């Protein structure tokens, strides 16, 4: 049995292609310990000056202490997981703000990464990540969502990353059906190898 953290970030609820794919993965991984964090249904606070002070580990005010406690909770969930499932739809060529905010709260010096003489080093090594990406159009792997997710996960030490794409969903119902079927086939392959 494995610990799995599922991050949903779509604002579209049950209509979301990435949420539907995340639910499909959850169904396939029954029997594991699964924690689901829906960043749209359970929004994180806006990452502002108080949050930046808090995640540096220097909280002084009550608000900053609460933000540090939130960051600690998010990091604990992440540290406990062996596998991370992330729903990452493309909104205006990038990830949703909810997902960006999540990484702002968990990317903490000396906790999830550290600076060394050779540059930054991620501290959350040995984890797997499966990214569920949905795009209205057709994009190659150089798109911003893929590049950002590879970069931020690598920054915190997660380098075993696989991508599942549902592309062209903006082309209509037939395209959605085809994209979902293709994505589910890829998910089946990945889950079988876990």
Curated annotation (Swiss-Prot):
The keyword Flavoprotein applies. One of its GO terms (molecular function) is oxidoreductase activity, acting on NAD(P)H as acceptor. The gene is azoR. It comes from Haemophilus influenzae (strain ATCC 51907 / DSM 11121 / KW20 / Rd). InterPro entries: Flavodoxin_fold, Flavoprotein-like_sf, FMN-dep_NADH:Q_OxRdtase_AzoR1, NADH:quinone_OxRdtase_FMN_depd. It is an enzyme of class 1 (oxidoreductase). The keyword Cell wall biogenesis/degradation does not apply. Belongs to the azoreductase type 1 family. This is FMN-dependent NADH:quinone oxidoreductase.
């Amino acid at each position: 049995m494995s610990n799995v953290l599922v991050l949903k970030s779509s604002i579209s609820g049950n209509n979301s292609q990435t949420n539907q794919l995340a639910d499909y993965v959850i169904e396939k991984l029954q029997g594991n310990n699964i924690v689901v964090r829906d960043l749209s249904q359970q929004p994180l606070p806006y990452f502002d000056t108080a949050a930046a002070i808090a995640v540096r580990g220097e909280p002084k005010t009550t608000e900053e202490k609460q933000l540090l406690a939130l960051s600690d909770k998010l990091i604990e969930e992440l540290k406990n997981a062996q596998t991370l499932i992330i729903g990452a739809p493309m909104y205006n060529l990038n990830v949703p703000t909810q997902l960006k905010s999540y990484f702002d709260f968990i990317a903490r010096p000396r906790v999830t990464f550290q600076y060394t003489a050779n540059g930054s080093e991620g501290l959350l090594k040995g984890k797997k990540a499966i990214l569920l990406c949905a795009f209205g159009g057709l994009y190659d792997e150089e798109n911003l969502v893929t590049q950002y997710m590879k970069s931020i996960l690598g920054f915190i030490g997660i380098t075993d990353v696989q991508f599942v794409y549902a592309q062209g969903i903006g082309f209509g119902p037939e395209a959605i059906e085809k994209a979902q079927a293709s994505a589910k086939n890829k998910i089946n392959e990945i889950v079988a190898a876990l």
